[in-house]
């Protein structure tokens, strides 16, 4: 009986990570370590190459100049029959949304105005029946409370308001410290660590709900 239960707890489904920078890498590292469940496939989407500012990558053994999206393949030593990394070394645009195939889609793109493309990704994922989570302000020194709740539940968060203007008003989870550029605080490794934990846990729960 116990053996049968253990045998049934195998990886299932797919989680897509849209954006694989400092936060995405942390989430990816968590996901590849999950056992007795978790994703069968992890899709990684990012068109950028690693440079000298990507310290968390070089600390983990990455080479400057290699694609960020390829790096999780190097770290994941699982047999592909157990867990497969699908690396897509390009940024998601309105023209390649069909590359996104995850049951759960976690969006952590940064730099500039990312709201319009994030909204398109969310809408595309929802059309496919996928569940979604993204960030909306993750600044802070590291002792902030990380909130994870539906977009419909937030107040006084300009990033959330902008996403709502793009038509995302419900059935989308947001992870945030509620600290933004306006608050003049840094983004520390401690904050990224905690946000990554919350996004990982939430993504795994969403995936489990899809298959149980």
Question: What is the meaning of each model-derived region?
Answer:
Residues 1-212:
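Adenine nucleotide-associated cytosolic modules
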């Amino acid at each position: 009986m116990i053996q049968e239960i253990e045998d049934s707890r195998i990886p299932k489904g797919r989680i897509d990570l849209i954006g694989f920078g400092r936060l995405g890498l942390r989430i990816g590292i968590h996901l590849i370590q999950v056992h007795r469940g978790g994703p069968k496939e992890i899709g990684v989407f990012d068109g950028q190459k690693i440079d000298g500012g990507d310290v968390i990558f070089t600390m983990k053994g990455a080479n400057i100049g290699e694609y960020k999206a390829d790096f999780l393949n190097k770290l994941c030593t699982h047999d592909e029959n157990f867990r497969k990394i699908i690396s897509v070394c390009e940024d998601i645009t309105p023209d390649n949304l069909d590359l996104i195939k995850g049951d759960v889609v976690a969006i952590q793109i940064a730099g500039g105005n990312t709201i319009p493309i994030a909204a398109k990704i969310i809408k595309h994922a929802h059309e496919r029946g996928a569940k979604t989570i993204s960030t909306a302000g993750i600044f802070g020194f590291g002792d902030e409370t990380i909130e994870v709740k539906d977009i419909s539940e937030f107040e006084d968060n300009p990033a959330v308001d902008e996403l709502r203007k793009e038509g995302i008003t419900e059935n989308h989870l947001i992870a945030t410290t509620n600290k933004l550029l306006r608050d003049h605080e840094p983004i520390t490794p401690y904050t990224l660590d905690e946000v990554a934990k919350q996004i990982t846990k939430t993504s795994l729960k969403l995936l489990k709900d899809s298959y149980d």
